[in-house]
Structures are given as structure tokens and as C-alpha cells.
């Protein structure tokens, strides 16, 4: 008789995505004070296309944590960062539970620390984008490394009137969304000056 439910036991017994990604360029950690476990997520993200090429993890957690990390890693490989926009704890937990079965209240932190580690890795990638940016004008979209000059050029060339139109042209505003108000401000300024 297995200690864990069948699907969790299967992933716990034969994990496929442990270790570091070969070309890791984003790392994030999530930890639980409930049981003392941690998950560290290693991502390889294509700098041009912003596609997650590989996702790996390390953990000292239980079978529930390992299974949740396995499902997370499998689900995000091949996804573009824009595909993950707006993913929150509840949606993530729902996806994990649809794959593994419902986690009891005392096991939810096992999945939540995986999501925390993913968020931290994406934050790490954004920080790398900011560090690598070298330009005269401000960096508006840190998720995709899009400068004020680029956005102004798109607004002028395409007569973009919405943040969504700018996003369709260069992905700005389609990641975390924190730059959307700045993009709208640039659109409004262009409209006033035209």
C-alpha cells in the first residue's frame, strides 16, 4: 500500500524535472514555515521570444510538494510569459488539483510554495531584463525589456489607440501588467500632440 495517493506516488517515485535547467537564467525560491520545506525553481527563458524552454526544480519537500512541482514544471515548459499573465494562486492550485486530485487544507502549502517559487523566478528574470537594458529613454515594460522609444515608435507608426494594440505589436503590457498605465499615458500624450 502506497503512502501517497496513486498519482502523487507515481510522480514522487519517478520525478522527471529535478535539478537545474542547463541554461538557467531565472531562479526563484518558495518556502513553507508550516513544515520547513522549500522549492527552488530554475527556468531557461528565451530572451527574444520570452518562451520558457526548460523548467526544473529542487526541493526538500514531501511527495505532495514534489508532485506539485512536477506538474508546474510540465505545464509551463513551452509557454510564453504572456501565457502566464494573470495566473494567480487559486487558478494555479485548481490546475494542480485537476491533475493530482484535491489537496487537503493541511497540504495546500505544498502547492502554494511551488507557485511562490515560480513567481520569484519570473521576478528574477524581470530584474535581469532591467540590468541588461541600456538605452537613452526609460524602460517601460520590464517583463519584455521594451523601452519608451520603442513604444512611442509603435504608437506613431501604427496609430495604436489602446494598450492592447501596443501589446499586440511588441508584448509590452502583456506580462505582469504593471506598465499598462504608463503605456496608456504615452498613448494619451501622442493623441494630444497629434
Placement of each model-derived feature along the sequence:
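Domain-level signature for proteins that mediate thiol-based redox and metal-cofactor handling
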Residues: 1-194
Amino acid at each position: 500500500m502506497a503512502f501517497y495517493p496513486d498519482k502523487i506516488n507515481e510522480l514522487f517515485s519517478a520525478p522527471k524535472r529535478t535539478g537545474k535547467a542547463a541554461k538557467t537564467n531565472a531562479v526563484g525560491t518558495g518556502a513553507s514555515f508550516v513544515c520547513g520545506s522549500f522549492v527552488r525553481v530554475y527556468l531557461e527563458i528565451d530572451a527574444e521570444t520570452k518562451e520558457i524552454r526548460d523548467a526544473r526544480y529542487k526541493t526538500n519537500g514531501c511527495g505532495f510538494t514534489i508532485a506539485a512541482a512536477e506538474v508546474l514544471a510540465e505545464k509551463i515548459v513551452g509557454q510564453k510569459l504572456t501565457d502566464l499573465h494573470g495566473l494567480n494562486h487559486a487558478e494555479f492550485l485548481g490546475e494542480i488539483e485537476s491533475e493530482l486530485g484535491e489537496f487537503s487544507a493541511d497540504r495546500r502549502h505544498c502547492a502554494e510554495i511551488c507557485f511562490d517559487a515560480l513567481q520569484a523566478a519570473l521576478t528574477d528574470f524581470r530584474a535581469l531584463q532591467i540590468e541588461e537594458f541600456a538605452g537613452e529613454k526609460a524602460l517601460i515594460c520590464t517583463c519584455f525589456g521594451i523601452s519608451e522609444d520603442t513604444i512611442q515608435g509603435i504608437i506613431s507608426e501604427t496609430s495604436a489607440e489602446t494598450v492592447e494594440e501596443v501589446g499586440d505589436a511588441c508584448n509590452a503590457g502583456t506580462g505582469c501588467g504593471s506598465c499598462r498605465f504608463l503605456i496608456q499615458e504615452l498613448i494619451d500624450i501622442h493623441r494630444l500632440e497629434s
